[in-house]
């Protein structure tokens, strides 16, 4: 290897060389590749492509030319890089889903929203669009500076005239070294209105500009959620804009629904979006979707169809899709552009100010150019006028000259003409010597003088020049402006949760003995008088019956406590809403129960984070525990331990308390104990608890409830044979925790063991459910108030092999109030007893009443008289028992 001469070797520190070389590279990428110019919104490659199209005459009125020809010309003259980078840039300018206002009119396959690439450049053709001409208009009138190309053999524009604000109209994105830009597209009409407002009020605020420019306007349309992100981006140059697909929920027959997506967020790959949805369904992260189809076509546009299972809530599924898929995404705004050749972060007003200044410069330079041309022409016309005034002398002088040069010099000396004027006279044809041509020259000269005066007036007055800019922008707006595509929705969408999409209403959740669960509107059940037959609450399977029932709001939490001492959580709306006769869905489809685990208690809670509330637990063996509600604020899908106990024990009931209540525990043999809640110290979530009541042989806990110290509430007792009564809470004295309790009812074969012990105020309705699925709703105030030892009065007449399985309180609301004149009538029986007929409670939908089925509604008068006499005998027996009441068993 030959040695290099010493003079060609320069020793440098490697650290300095790396620093300087990398800086040179970085600046080259920033200035000459990745960032757009603030004036025309174009990167060098886009500018060179458009200029190349213009130079080749590929205007909209000409035929398409092969893309390979365009790419080759641009690469050879202006852009010495790979042909693929040039072609990809041109393809993007032709895509109507990438550019709000496409700058290239492509013919052939130019890609799709599914990420499909364009066909090879040898197959596609292109030309300029009409709006592209406005970027290049007046480029040959010295409106911008030209620079040498890469080899110095060609000239290329340093910037385009850009007669519309392309930087914001089509946006830009690019990654440089140490910085990146991401500018969203906007609506041309709004942008030009904003520029016009700025031109009239240079001190305009960004808030005032936003009255004209609402926000980005994406080519794929869709929705923008809220204006806070837009405002932040416009004020600072940086911000995050929430984009969302446009989706509607359609009915598809049979009570089924589908979600149809017709617009997707900007720059989202539709095929990948669909794959993501399918992946979530496959992994069971989103439940309730039965089918997913892409029905997009040229005729219908974007159309992605998502079929929803019949028992699923389409609104909730759609909300989850927004959260977990690209159906909702964000656009990170970073408005960096080249300002005077340097990268700078700009806000909305700065972008418009720089554009307006560029337009003023373009119009000023064009005016100056036109003025020069007009003066040059006027100068020539002045010479021609002189020639026509002295035509004979001009002809004589020319004839006497030996050469053109001598003739020109003679004309200049004799008639005081310039070289250009003399040359124009020598070039003048003889036909211009006619009288008609002389008149034309005079008319043209006078017009030029007026035109020169107008041009000088424009240059002399900045306001006149600015008005010209306004007029030209207005013309472009009227020609190319269109309606906004992207809708901006106002509201707190950033924190949108499932319940925001669910109307809040009172519901009933039922759980059957065989663990089938469902929800119904509370208005499904209608109020009846004591002793009514009830309505069919569900069509139960053989040997199945409703075992539990709670009322709550669709937005409330439902805590499910199991016999094994575990707790699970659902929102009210997450339980499927089914028909009144439906059996429901298996509870294991809603919550992940363990083997041999059944729900023992369901309670509704509004705020799980509350520090002022507690949960009190009672087990079958008389163990009681108090734990803070906040311990249960985070319940996993697979549940958590709520209480620990021995293997032969199980959880009976849970109650929500304020911490200052009295605890009431009742047993199946009609014992009840009352003690202050304060005697129970709060324990951890997994703690075992302490003894609450001492049980006799064969007895077990069936009820748990709470009451205030000076409460006017009453204790409601319901037995398995359909008897019940109310007794004032204060009839039960306070005792120490762990005692045996006092008698709360007399148990006989007629009324049976106690199935429910709870507290009431008298303002509630009561729902009584039998093992046959029959539900009756009655006013608690209609139930007789008796002493502690009374058996109670009949609340519901039971058929053979029927017994009361569960009882629940329902708060009265407006839907439950019936109008005597319109919804109920009263009749008097032969023995003077007033009996009220059933009332129909209107559904929430106006004009649509729910007519519930009546079980064995045909009853004769004799049955009614027997019922009254039996009730009278019950009351006599209760009085006898009261006189023999013993406080302690």
Swiss-Prot record:
Task: Name the Pfam families for this protein.
Answer: DNA_gyraseA_C, DNA_topoisoIV
- Identify a single GO molecular function assigned to this protein: DNA binding
UniProt lists compositionally biased (Basic and acidic residues) regions at 863-875
| SUPFAM superfamilies the UniProt entry points to | GyrA/ParC C-terminal domain-like, Type II DNA topoisomerase
Q: Which PROSITE patterns match?
A: TOPO_IIA
Q: List the disulfide bonds.
A: none
Region (Disordered), start-end ranges: 811-889
Q: Where is this motif: GyrA-box?
A: 528-534
Its function, per the record, reads:
A type II topoisomerase that negatively supercoils closed circular double-stranded (ds) DNA in an ATP-dependent manner to modulate DNA topology and maintain chromosomes in an underwound state. Negative supercoiling favors strand separation, and DNA replication, transcription, recombination and repair, all of which involve strand separation. Also able to catalyze the interconversion of other topological isomers of dsDNA rings, including catenanes and knotted rings. Type II topoisomerases break and join 2 DNA strands simultaneously in an ATP-dependent manner.
Regarding protein family, the annotation reads: Belongs to the type II topoisomerase GyrA/ParC subunit family.
State any further remark.
Few gyrases are as efficient as E.coli at forming negative supercoils. Not all organisms have 2 type II topoisomerases; in organisms with a single type II topoisomerase this enzyme also has to decatenate newly replicated chromosomes.
Q: From the Swiss-Prot or TrEMBL record, give the protein name.
A: DNA gyrase subunit A
């Amino acid at each position: 290897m030959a040695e290099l001469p010493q003079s060609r070797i320069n020793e440098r520190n490697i650290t300095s060389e790396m620093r300087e070389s990398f800086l040179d590279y970085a600046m080259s990428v920033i200035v000459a590749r990745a960032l757009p110019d603030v004036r025309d919104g174009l990167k060098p490659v886009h500018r060179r492509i458009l200029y190349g199209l213009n130079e080749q005459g590929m205007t909209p009125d000409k035929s398409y030319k092969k893309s390979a020809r365009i790419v080759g010309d641009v690469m050879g003259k202006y852009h010495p890089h790979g042909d693929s980078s040039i072609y990809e840039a041109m393809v993007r300018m032709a895509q109507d889903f990438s550019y709000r206002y496409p700058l290239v009119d492509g013919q052939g396959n130019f890609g799709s929203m599914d990420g499909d690439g364009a066909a090879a450049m040898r197959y596609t053709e292109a030309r300029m669009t009409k709006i592209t001409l406005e970027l290049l208009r007046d480029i040959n009138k010295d409106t911008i500076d030209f620079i040498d190309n890469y080899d110095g053999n060609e000239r290329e524009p340093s910037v385009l005239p850009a007669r519309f604000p392309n930087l914001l109209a089509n946006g830009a994105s690019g990654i440089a070294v140490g910085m990146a830009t991401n500018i969203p597209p906007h609506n041309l009409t709004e942008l030009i209105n904003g520029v016009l407002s700025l031109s009239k009020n240079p001190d305009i605020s960004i808030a005032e500009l936003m009255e004209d420019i609402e926000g980005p306007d994406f080519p794929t349309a869709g929705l923008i959620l809220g204006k806070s992100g837009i405002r932040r981006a416009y004020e600072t140059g940086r911000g995050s804009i929430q984009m969302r697909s446009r989706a509607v929920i359609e009915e598809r027959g049979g009570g089924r629904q589908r979600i149809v997506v017709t617009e997707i967020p900007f720059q989202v790959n539709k095929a990948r979006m669909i794959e993501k949805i399918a992946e979530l369904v496959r992994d069971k992260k989103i439940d309730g979707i039965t089918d997913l189809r892409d029905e997009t076509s040229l005729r219908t546009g974007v159309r992605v169809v998502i079929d929803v299972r019949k028992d699923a809530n389409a609104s909730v599924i759609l909300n989850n899709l927004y959260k977990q898929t690209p159906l909702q995404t964000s656009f990170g705004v970073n408005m960096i552009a080249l300002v005077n050749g340097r990268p700078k972060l700009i806000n909305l007003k700065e972008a418009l100010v720089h554009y307006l200044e560029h337009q003023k410069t373009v119009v000023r330079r064009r005016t100056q150019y036109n003025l020069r041309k007009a003066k040059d022409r006027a100068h020539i016309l002045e010479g021609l006028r002189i020639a026509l005034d002295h035509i004979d002398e001009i002809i004589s002088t020319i004839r006497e000259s030996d050469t053109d040069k001598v003739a020109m010099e003679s004309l200049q000396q004799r008639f005081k003409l310039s070289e250009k004027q003399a040359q124009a006279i020598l070039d003048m044809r003889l036909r211009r010597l006619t009288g008609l041509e002389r008149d034309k020259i005079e008319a043209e000269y006078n017009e030029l003088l007026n035109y020169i005066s107008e041009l000088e007036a424009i240059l002399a007055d900045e306001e006149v020049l600015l008005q010209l800019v306004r007029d030209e922008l207005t013309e472009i707006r009227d020609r190319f402006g269109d309606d906004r595509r992207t809708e901006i929705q106002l509201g707190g969408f950033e924190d949108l949760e499932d319940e925001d999409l669910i109307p809040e209403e009172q519901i009933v959740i039922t759980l059957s003995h065989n663990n089938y669960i469902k929800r119904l509107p509370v208005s499904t059940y209608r109020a009846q008088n004591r002793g009514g037959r009830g309505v069919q609450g569900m069509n139960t399977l053989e040997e199945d019956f409703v075992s539990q029932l709670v009322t709550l709001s669709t937005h409330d939490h439902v805590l499910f406590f199991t016999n094994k001492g575990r707790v699970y959580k659902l929102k009210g709306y997450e339980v499927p809403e089914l028909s009144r006769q439906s059996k429901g869905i298996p509870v294991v489809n809603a919550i992940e129960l363990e083997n041999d685990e059944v729900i023992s208690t369901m309670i509704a809670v509004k705020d799980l984070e509350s520090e002022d509330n507690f949960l009190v637990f009672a087990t079958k063996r008389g163990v009681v525990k108090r734990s803070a509600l906040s311990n249960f604020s985070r319940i996993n899908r697979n549940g958590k331990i709520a209480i620990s106990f021995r293997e032969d024990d199980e959880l009976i009931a849970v109650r929500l308390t304020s911490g200052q209540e009295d605890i009431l525990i009742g047993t199946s043999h009609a014992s009840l104990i009352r003690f202050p809640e304060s005697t129970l110290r709060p324990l951890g979530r997994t703690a075992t608890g302490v003894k609450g009541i001492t049980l006799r042989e064969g007895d077990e806990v069936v009820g748990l409830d709470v009451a205030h110290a000076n409460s006017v509430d009453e204790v409601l007792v319901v037995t398995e044979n359909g008897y019940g009564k109310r007794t004032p809470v204060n009839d039960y004295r306070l005792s120490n925790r762990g005692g045996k309790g006092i008698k709360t009812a007399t148990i006989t074969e007629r009324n049976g063991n106690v199935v429910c012990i709870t507290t009431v105020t008298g303002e509630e309705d009561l729902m009584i459910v039998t093992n046959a699925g029959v539900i009756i709703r009655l006013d608690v105030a209609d139930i007789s108030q008796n002493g502690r030892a009374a058996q109670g009065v009949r609340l519901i007449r039971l058929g053979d092999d029927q017994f009361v399985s569960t009882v629940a309180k329902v708060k009265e609301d407006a839907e439950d109030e019936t109008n005597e004149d319109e919804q109920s009538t009263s009749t008097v029986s032969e023995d003077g007893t007033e009996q009220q007929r059933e009332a129909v409670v209107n559904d929430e939908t106006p004009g649509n009443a729910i007519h519930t089925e009546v079980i064995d509604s045909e009853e004769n008068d004799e049955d009614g008289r027997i019922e009254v006499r039996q009730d009278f005998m019950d009351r006599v027996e209760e009085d006898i028992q009261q006189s023999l009441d013993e406080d302690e068993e």
